């Protein structure tokens, strides 16, 4: 069962809403049903149990309350829940919805920590169910248990649930750079893999007033220019050619007119492309390997 083509976003509290960032998610993915949640729509559409409402009311931090609503919405509707401080770069590909998913927060800065910035599930999925079960059976008052909200009911809770699963195949965990290429600690992704969104870390940096005027870093945006390279069917040096290309800055369209074994080799280079680095990050664009002018994923 694939993830429903629904995008959820939520905003509660008195702070100005990062509307431009949120619109970037909505407008970049027009084939998705878009569901915006606020205090009014939550009251009108969500039939939340009294016990769960009591837990939400016990939690003092607005970001923690948002996390608590998030779990309920994902369990009931399924779909893709995207934080309000995420900015879209390219549309979400359909293959992402083949299985429930989230990503790591950052493999270097915070190994094994699951990110809640974008999560996607089928309805009644085991992960939101287990998260809600834990919430109902534990004290989630941050000031009392002296645990920060993100660790108690956000990424920390997602990580605990995921790592406790006997069958982890129920969800796909994508690399952090898919959705969080620039971490709030300063670690930045400099590879050539496809980046779908950036995260502006609004609650961490307390910068929601600035998010709507921020620009996407150049090295994450799709390139404006590219170089077309055709590989004929008599080329026996494909590995040497690709080894040379991976050390160059730029965007290369590889048009295959060669044997199937070479096509297979190019497809296998996905991990190599993800780990590419450059000496001149200001001039970095992305490699795009094409199979008969279609992007290979």
Please report, for each region that a protein language model flagged, where it lies by residue.
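Enrichment for repetitive, rod-forming helical segments
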Residues: 16, 77, 206, 271, ...
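Generic structural signal for beta-strand residues in well-ordered domains
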Residues: 27, 79, 112, 245-247, ...
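Glycosyltransferase-associated regions of secretory-pathway enzymes
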Residues: 1-66, 82-226
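Feature targets compositionally biased, intrinsically disordered low-complexity regions
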Residues: 77-78, 190-192, 201, 243, ...
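Short amphipathic alpha-helical segments and helix-helix/interface helices
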Residues: 22-26, 71, 93, 158-163, ...
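Non-catalytic N-terminal targeting/anchoring module and adjacent flexible stem/linker
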Residues: 213-297
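Glycine-centered loop/turn motif at secondary-structure junctions
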Residues: 29, 78, 166, 270-273
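Small-residue hinge/turn detector
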Residues: 67-79
């Amino acid at each position: 069962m694939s993830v429903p083509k629904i995008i959820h976003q939520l905003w509660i509290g008195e702070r100005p809403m990062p509307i431009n960032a949120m619109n970037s998610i909505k407008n970049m993915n027009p084939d998705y049903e878009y569901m915006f949640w606020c205090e009014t729509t939550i009251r009108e559409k969500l039939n939340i149990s009294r016990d769960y409402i009591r837990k939400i009311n016990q939690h003092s931090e607005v970001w923690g309350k948002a996390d608590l609503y998030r779990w309920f919405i994902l369990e009931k509707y399924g779909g893709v829940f995207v934080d309000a401080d995420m900015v879209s770069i390219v549309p979400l590909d359909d293959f992402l919805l083949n299985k429930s998913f989230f990503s790591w927060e950052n493999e270097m800065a915070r190994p094994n920590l699951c990110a809640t910035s974008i999560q996607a599930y089928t309805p009644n999925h085991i992960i939101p169910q287990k998260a809600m079960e834990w919430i109902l059976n534990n004290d989630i008052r941050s000031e009392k248990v002296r645990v920060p909200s993100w660790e108690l009911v956000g990424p920390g809770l997602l990580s605990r649930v995921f790592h406790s699963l006997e069958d982890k195949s129920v969800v796909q965990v994508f690399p952090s750079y898919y959705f969080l290429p620039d971490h709030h600690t300063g670690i930045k992704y400099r590879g050539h893999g496809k980046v779908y969104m950036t995260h502006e870390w609004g609650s961490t940096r307390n910068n929601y007033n600035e998010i709507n005027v921020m620009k996407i870093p150049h090295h994450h945006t799709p390139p404006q220019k590219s170089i077309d390279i055709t590989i004929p069917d008599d080329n026996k040096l494909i590995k040497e050619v690709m080894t040379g290309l991976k050390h160059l800055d730029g965007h290369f369209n590889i048009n295959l007119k060669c044997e199937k074994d070479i096509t297979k080799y190019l497809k296998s280079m996905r991990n190599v492309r993800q780990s590419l680095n450059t000496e001149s990050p200001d001039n970095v664009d992305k490699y795009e390997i094409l199979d008969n002018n279609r992007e290979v994923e």
